[in-house]
Structures are given as C-alpha cells and as structure tokens.
C-alpha cells in the first residue's frame, strides 16, 4: 500500500489529533479494511457513527456553553469568518477543548472529523426546525461527504 497517501489522507481528516489517528488505524486494522482510500473512508464513517468518550465530552461542552455552540454553528453552517482571538471567551473555550484552530488569522474547525461530527450533532438537535432543512440543502457546500 501507499503509506504516504494513506498517512496524508488520515492527516487530512484528523489534523493529527492523536485519538482520531489511533482510532482510525485501529478500526482499519481490526476491521480488516484495506489500507487505501476506501479503507480510510470506511474507518472514518465507522468512527463518526460510534459512541466514544471524545464525542461524549464534545457533546457535553457544546451543551454547557450555548454561546460556544452558536459560534461553531456560524462557522459550520454559515461559513462565517471568525477572527482568531484568544481573548474572545467562546473562542478561548473552543481552543481549550481543541474544537478550533487558527489558520492565517481565521478560526477553523480543528479537523474534518470534528466538523462533520459537530454538523451531525447540530442537525440532529435541530431536525424539527428550519435550520435543519436549510442545513440539508447547504450540506454539500460545507461538509465533505464520505463514501458509504
């Protein structure tokens, strides 16, 4: 297999977040998945659907800090450019929990997996609202669809 390609693809989805990298590799190894594009996508899909302590903790933090949730929603759903500023209370919390990172002065969701997971969380919490219908319409523009 092309270990550089697979490693880069895993990095593209995880931004090197240690638990995510390890878990994807574990899913691929224990699940007998191929070490190629399809195997990585299958492992990422599996990871996004599973119950784990990382996602439990993320959900708790989003619930505990409603203004943080609103900031994350603005970035994910609206594509809002938020300046990276440690003194912004919500961003400071998001930085502390590794929800976001800085890139060229802007705030980005830390990695594709977090972006997709948060998107799914917010959509599931709002499925009976107009934001749900708009999010489903806009999803292809903002969230990378994974092959199933």
Where do the language-model regions lie?
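Winged-helix-like regulatory helical subdomains adjacent to P-loop NTPase cores
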Residues: 1-97, 103
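Alpha-helix/helix-capping structural signal
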Residues: 19, 112-113
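Short, well-ordered loop/turn and helix-capping segments at boundaries between secondary-structure elements
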Residues: 30, 100, 120-124
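Minor-groove-contacting beta-hairpin "wing" of winged helix-turn-helix DNA-binding domains
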Residues: 106-111
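Short, amphipathic alpha-helical interaction segments positioned at domain boundaries
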Residues: 114-144
């Amino acid at each position: 297999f092309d270990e550089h390609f697979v490693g880069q693809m895993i990095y593209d989805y995880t931004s090197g977040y240690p638990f995510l990298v390890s878990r994807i590799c574990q899913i691929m190894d224990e699940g007998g998945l191929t070490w190629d594009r399809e195997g990585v996508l299958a492992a990422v899909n599996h990871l996004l659907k599973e119950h784990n302590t990382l996602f439990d903790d993320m959900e708790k933090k989003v619930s505990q800090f409603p203004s943080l949730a609103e900031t994350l929603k603005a970035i994910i759903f609206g594509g809002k450019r938020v300046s990276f500023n440690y003194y912004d209370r919500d961003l400071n919390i998001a930085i502390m929990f590794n929800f976001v990172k800085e890139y060229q002065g802007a705030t980005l969701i830390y990695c594709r997996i977090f972006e997709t997971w948060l998107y799914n969380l917010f959509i599931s919490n709002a499925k009976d609202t107009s934001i749900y219908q708009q999010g489903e319409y806009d999803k292809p523009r903002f969230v990378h669809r994974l092959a199933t």
